[in-house]
């Protein structure tokens, strides 16, 4: 097993210092008779371009400013109050769920939030303004990450001492990825990571000990992967130089929402593309060609599927940067059908374990970039 040094509290210390620097700048502006402001990059694909060389989206520099004016008085107050709350969390080494942060604001008088989405948006704006992850500011989502199993040891420092989880000794269960993966120390001698769209397929592969037969780490994405899941996979990939193979349903959602988010990021978190995206990831299936080659049971494309494909071909810089993806999506459009991972059960419950995945993993020419 390759062991890395334990992760320190440095990210939270950096976040705290950035909060202090921003507050100091606003104070200096006030003392000079200027309106204090908080500048942040615009968090949307309109402020990004796909850099094929890097394999991820890059911000193009569009910014917005939150200024202490009559029109922005409330949102500015909400932003500074949230900044203060984040500083308190870091100073006390505490955390707040996004839901808790919303309710904390109910004690802020006129600066309170009317709904949680507005509160979440301010937290993500601060994340963008400071250039740090919201988790490093002390804010975590309600949901945990996904499940993981395989040749991996996870070491976590707890108040009771060092906790070691051996992901090969969990019976039929799996390790649940926590919200903040920064504090985890990871040891592995696996050959690759297999990220799986559905919990059902993950359960099948785990039950058959696919990870043991192929010396790989299995990660359940549970649909579009949560931030914690993406950061966990990215750490394993970068720290242990592990290839990341992705196994989704053969449909536009699996390709352009789930796989695309893991590989190059999402529009909402475009400012974090370098911290969350995994450009080296590859999709091994289910591809449109697999549907033909393996004669899989199918369902007709829905209207929303067709719309998603056409939009991707026309407007998605990721798709437009890869001829292989353009060809695959046009092929699916011509076929007019989609297929689920579980459709491989047509040939028996163990077919995906004994035949399909071993063949796909071995033949890189069938992968999509």
UniProtKB/Swiss-Prot annotation:
Function statement: Relaxes both positive and negative superturns and exhibits a strong decatenase activity.
PANTHER family: MEIOTIC RECOMBINATION PROTEIN SPO11
Protein's name according to its UniProt entry: Type 2 DNA topoisomerase 6 subunit A
Pfam family of the protein (one): TP6A_N
Naturally occurring in which organism (per UniProt): Methanocaldococcus jannaschii (strain ATCC 43067 / DSM 2661 / JAL-1 / JCM 10045 / NBRC 100440) (Methanococcus jannaschii)
Cofactor, how bound (note): Mg(2+) is directly coordinated by Glu-197 and Asp-249 as well as indirectly coordinated through 2 water molecules by Asp-251.
Taxonomy of the source species: Archaea, Methanobacteriati, Methanobacteriota, Methanomada group, Methanococci
Oligomer status and interactors: Homodimer. Heterotetramer of two Top6A and two Top6B chains.
UniProt KW keywords: ATP-binding, DNA-binding, Isomerase, Magnesium, Metal-binding, Nucleotide-binding, Topoisomerase
Residue ranges occupied by any Topo IIA-type catalytic domain in the UniProt entry: 10-146
Name of the gene encoding the protein in the UniProt record: top6A
